[in-house]
Amino acid sequence: MTNFFDILSERKGQLFSTMIEHIQISFIALLIATAIAVPLGILLTKTKTISEIVMNIAAILQTIPSLALLGLMIPLFGIGRVPAIIALVVYALLPILRNTYTGIKEVDPSLIEAAKGIGMKPFRRLTKVELPIAMPVIMAGVRTAMVLIIGTATLAALIGAGGLGDLILLGIDRNNASLILLGAIPAALLAIIFDLILRFMAKLSYKKLLMTLGVIVMIIILAIAIPMFAQKGDKITLAGKLGSEPSIITNMYKILIEEETKNTVEVKDGMGKTAFLFNALKSDDIDGYLEFTGTVLGELTKEPLKSKEEKKVYEQAKQSLEKKYQMTMLKPMKYNNTYALAVKRDFAKQHNIRTIGDLNKVKDQLKPGFTLEFNDRPDGYKAVQKAYNLNLDNIRTMEPKLRYQAINKGNINLIDAYSTDAELKQYDMVVLKDDKHVFPPYQGAPLFKESFLKKHPEIKKPLNKLENKISDEDMQMMNYKVTVKNEDPYTVAKDYLKAKGLIK
């Protein structure tokens, strides 16, 4: 509990900003969903056949898993708030639509006949009789949609939309329960608070309710517009994959660029896996990110390696990107964050395992746990399987940080790893020698579109200061500080740059 309050004190600024983002995303989605569902619900009361079809479509849309829906939005709308809001609107439609339809249908027919009898036109009957009577039922649907939106909006962080999900994902990535709670508790409180507010609004008279909604809409519009007008100048957006290492290096990029140029850099940590960030770069949702030479050839351009030498692999990756995507990598750093297979030290000693090939001796005793990416990549498990004839059964796939917890608890006994992972040191792991040299070199370098670098040639010099800098040991130690000691990635990055004389 003490650790939670320490984290709260350290990150209160981030908590406030992510909470504001969460509220903005949620309310925009709710307003759009209400603006669509209420008029549509009213129209559907006029025809039973079409109403059933539309209701069924809305119900089907709500059954789509939220992660899948967010993933489907990326090719269509890129990343950020727009696809997140669209996905949330889809989820919010059904309860508002259904309650609007039900509320209007349940209005006493005798009241409608009385309204007709005194000469009320259809629109006036709707606004003066049907909607005021149906409003409590409609507001109940809006309340349900609001709670649903606030909860689902935490997943918006997966596509770079921000919100309290940023803190939750960071906590999962760092294996830090306090960070998870720092995002989860405010999200739950927001759902409760706004449910109470909407419940209070449902008790207002029809006129007061409309006035209150008008004021809320104006406040939201101002809350969105003011920050947009307040932004000045160009801002470079650099993103990082999941994990402490991309966060540290991306913050180094930020510090170096801001130290030597007039540019402002926004860092988006933990935005996802390789394909996600690469697509974000292609669609200009981000300007650049840390990528690795082996990943470029194995996953992005899908070219066979012409050499296993680090320099030649870098040149091949660079030329391949330039030819196929009009992108380029700047100079690479020294460390080689290659894939590896690892076991606990006592397991390795017990079975005399030193190399990947030795695993065939104990294949029946292996309980492998791999990341989804490693298990699926052609330069990951598939390459190991082919080179070593190592066909493993019952492979469990999981998020990167979870596999270390699982092997520490004994649920699995073989994992994929990166050679600079801090957890290798933390959990006393042994990296098995890749005696057939299956894994290519993985040197990290900043990846940008060539067109972006033509607009910002001034960032090349500061970023290239990291050329041939940062050893494997340096990187593992920095990862250890962030992952195990819970130090801030920005501070760790700045301390390293100062220690090496790369900044003042």
UniProtKB/Swiss-Prot annotation:
UniProtKB keywords: Hydrolase, Ion transport, Membrane, Nickel, Nickel transport, Transmembrane, Transmembrane helix, Transport
Membrane topology annotation: Multi-pass membrane protein
Domain ABC transmembrane type-1: 19-198
GO molecular function, one term: transmembrane transporter activity
Region span, Ergothioneine binding domain: 231-504
A GO term from the CC aspect: ATP-binding cassette (ABC) transporter complex
TM stretches of this protein: 25-45, 49-69, 70-90, 145-165, 178-198, 209-229
Record note on quaternary structure: The complex is probably composed of at least an ATP-binding protein (EgtUA) and a transmembrane protein (EgtUBC).
Family named by the database record: In the N-terminal section; belongs to the binding-protein-dependent transport system permease family. In the C-terminal section; belongs to the OsmX family.
Protein name: Probable ergothioneine transporter EgtUBC
